[in-house]
């Protein structure tokens, strides 16, 4: 069977897009589809435990989201949005920039008194390879001045950075959260393990 992109278009009213996370995390909604019977059930996320059995393997991604969105300034006073994508070495990163026309090779951008960057190269798909110059510890500077890269359909300001992290996040590197995991709580994970489900971690940076 051949598919067209239009086959996957659907209407999603803005008023149905949650602008703040559910509290507690595991009270969000969950859709369960039974492939064998075709049954569709609407549940509360914490009830996912009822669909898991002893010996099942639950794989979670323990990547941690960086506050990867930065705002830089050109020498002419223009503003450029910089999104960290991938660390290439100690000081060089692959980043997305907007607008791109202000970020030609050799261009220097100032982000703060402690942090600046120089554009070293442009990839075939338009990302920039940049080298950062900084005074202090890079990760500490980013944590202080960066903002969480929320999806464009989230319009409200994130009040607590930890709500865009999973409770098992360990390894810095993502530019977006593995969102399916945001709904687990420590208590729910404990109950799942107590039921005999094997919980194993993988590391896959998102973004």
Which residue ranges define each predicted feature?
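A cross-family signal for N-terminal binding/gating loops and helix N-caps
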Residues: 1-207
